[in-house]
A protein has these predicted regions:
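Hydrophilic extracytoplasmic domains
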Residues: 200-246
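Terminal domain-start segments
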Residues: 31-113
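N-terminal secretory signal peptides that target proteins for export/translocation
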Residues: 1-13
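Short coil/turn segments at the loop-to-beta-strand junctions that recur within blades
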Residues: 136-142, 183-189
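Surface-exposed loop/turn elements that mediate protein-protein interactions on large endomembrane-trafficking
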Residues: 45-74, 115-133, 166-185, 225-243
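Beta-strand C-termini and the immediately following turn/loop, strongest in propeller blades
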Residues: 94-97, 111-114, 154-160, 215-220
Length: 246
């Protein structure tokens, strides 16, 4: 007659319970991963924006229209301007943020919050993940980006403010695809003479077949570049004009 000890039965039950717990954890994790996130924008609101440079630095505040970015009905960021769909899953949008403008001597007072413009954010509709986009030489006051696919074209400003660059950057690529020096200190002074937002140059113009972008800081500095993946070439028409000018 076969005899089964109580210890063997308890050991088997323990293994079954452990296996069941592992299955529950794996199923829960799989469900959490597959659960879609709800990405939405809230209503537009007008706020006062006091730039640290430009006309607003010593004048009355400028008006900035912002709206919240919500993930699963929770506010994650504030944004301004239109969003650009990179793929069905990813889109980019510019960030708006509040900074504490209180002085050290005002530490006992409530924080003095001021709205400022930030850089670009990359949003994943599936995971709900939000991350900053690396745009070399992008100036949050003077630069305005024109998007095509996963490329951003804009006029960047050097850290000392003495150089203006035509830049094409690609998402998830550290180095820019294009970085052309438009002008030195004199050109920078001319371009920024108005001290207005987004005044580094005209908004770059994209065209397709082939993908190409035109930069125009002023009538004498107009160039069109053809973008092929990570490489860039000056448009043949621009090359002919430069040769004729020599």
């Amino acid at each position: 007659m076969l005899r089964i000890s109580c210890s063997s039965i308890s050991h088997s039950r323990g293994r079954i319970a452990l296996l069941f717990a592992v299955i529950v954890i794996l199923v829960s994790a799989a469900f959490a991963i597959s659960k879609p996130h709800v990405i939405a924008f809230g209503k537009w609101t007008s706020v006062q924006w006091l730039p640290e440079v430009g006309v607003g630095a010593s004048d009355k505040p400028l008006t900035l229209k912002i709206r919240p970015l919500l993930v699963d009905a929770r506010v994650k960021e504030f944004t301004f301007g239109p969003a650009h769909d990179v793929t069905e899953r990813l889109f980019v949008v510019r960030r708006a943020l509040r900074v504490n403008d209180s002085l050290p001597s005002e530490s006992t007072s409530p924080p003095h919050w001021q709205w400022q413009r930030g850089g670009w954010l990359l949003v994943d509709r599936v995971t709900g993940h939000i991350s900053p986009v690396n745009l070399p030489e992008f100036d949050v006051f003077y630069s305005a980006a024109s998007w095509y696919r996963d490329y951003a074209a804009y006029c960047g400003v050097s850290e000392d403010g003495k150089q203006i660059f035509a830049v094409v950057a690609q998402i998830n690529r550290r180095k820019p695809v294009l970085k052309w020096l438009i002008g030195e200190e004199k050109a920078a002074a001319e371009i920024q003479q108005g001290q207005n937002p987004d005044s580094a140059c005209r908004l770059p113009d994209w065209q397709r077949s082939p993908a190409r972008v035109t930069f125009e800081a002023n009538p004498s500095t107009k160039r069109t570049y053809v973008i092929r993946g990570h490489s860039v070439d000056l448009s043949s028409g621009e090359e002919e004009d430069e040769e004729a000018a020599k």
